[in-house]
Amino acid sequence: MSSQQHKFKRPDVSVRDKKLDTLNVQLKKIDTEIGLIRKQIDQHQVNDTTQQERKKLQDKNKEIIKIQADLKTRRSNIHDSIKQLDAQIKRKNNQIEEKLGKKAKFSSTAEAKQRINEIEESIASGDLSLVQEKLLVKEMQSLNKLIKDLVNIEPIRKSVDADKAKINQLKEELNGLNPKDVSNQFEENQQKLNDIHSKTQGVYDKRQTLFNKRAALYKKRDELYSQIRQIRADFDNEFKSFRAKLDKERLKREEEQRLSKLLEQKDVDMGKLQEKLTHAKIPAFTYEIGAIENSLLVLDPTYVKPKKNILPDLSSNALETKPARKVVADDLVLVTPKKDDFVNVAPSKSKKYKKKNQQKNTENEQPASIFNKVDGKFTLEPTLIATLAELDVTVPINSDDVKITVEQLKKKHEELLSKQEEQTKQNIESVEKEIEKLNLDYSNKEQQVKKELEEKRLKEQEESEKDKEN
């Protein structure tokens, strides 16, 4: 941790506190000045009697304003009603004109009946000509129709008269709602308030001056508080950045350590697979084929071991085999080895054992005779018996069996040679798949490590933010 703090400079608390102390001294001075101004404001007060009188006048003004608003509303409603009645009267007069016609000479039934009586008297006198009489009869018919129409429109006329009367009533009410008196009351009341204000103006001016000074001090104090908050915020941000760098460095170091361990383990596992791949590239069945060839050298005097140029620098003469000793199979006797010399267990097929035997067989192109004489008879060496058993080939106990064994060995030799290339390819592909899988597994493990560390970082960040909120 000390090395990290040396690498990342820690914010200096003393520098922050020094700045804050300077601002706190200024704040204390401003608070003292504000307290003095408050006392002065309390000393410059208008007396209670004047305050009460002014309050009464202000309340009276509020009532007058409310009355004026009510008067305005009522007058507006009356004007609206008069407009509606005028519209109704106009509509009703239009209805009357439509029924009577604009050229009607009589507007009442009495006038029409009087004219009918005059016409009847004229006709009854007999002084009229036939044409005059017909005209008067026609006029009388028109008058009778007019009388009917006048009777029908009489309710409309009465309604018009009622509307006119209502309009006159509303106009009288409107004249009664004169706002001038209320306005005069308001002006008188306001004048009294102005007089009180003039008397107390000096006090108010002094108080206003004090209010302005106090507001200026409030503003200056707010600026100091803002500077204090900014200093604290800057320090918190610097410290937060410092902690973030430490956490980032710690997580980075943890990631490097975990990835380093992962890489070391990968190198170990990859080394094993590379060694396995090296063995896989050795032609398949090398041990079995070599064992078969060495067995054939012993069992078949005519057999010539194929030349194999394992090391390109070696001459072909160095790899030539010596003639095998002829097997006399007439009186072969199977000899059971002693426990001290030979254990009757199939030899291990491990790579280590195969490699050891392969090297041994390669170095000894011409094996020593594995036949010994026991009581004047030839016997098989225990190593040959074990090899034939391992190859799953018949162990010869007479001359006929030797031929069978040779045939089986040659057949198995051909089978193994025919499958050698394909099997070698399969062995290599199998190991290469393991290597590919190993690379993929360690790549996934590496991604998992990075993911876990990222989740850890986010979790620590969330916990830090929660602690800060609390």
From Swiss-Prot:
It comes from the Eukaryota. Keywords: Coiled coil, Phosphoprotein. This is Nuclear segregation protein BFR1. Residues 349-358 have a biased composition (Basic residues). The lineage of its organism: Eukaryota, Fungi, Dikarya, Ascomycota, Saccharomycotina. Signal peptide: none annotated. Three regions of the protein are predicted to form a coiled-coil. It may adopt a rod-shaped rather than a globular configuration. Implicated in secretion, nuclear segregation and in maintenance of cell size. Residues 346-368, 447-470 are annotated as: Disordered. One of its GO terms (cellular component) is cytoplasm. The keyword Kinase does not apply. GO terms for molecular function: mRNA binding; RNA binding. One of its GO terms (biological process) is meiotic cell cycle. The modification Phosphothreonine is found at T336. The keyword Transmembrane does not apply. The modification Phosphoserine is found at S260, S369. Residues 17-178, 237-281, 398-469 form a coiled coil. Present with 33400 molecules/cell in log phase SD medium.
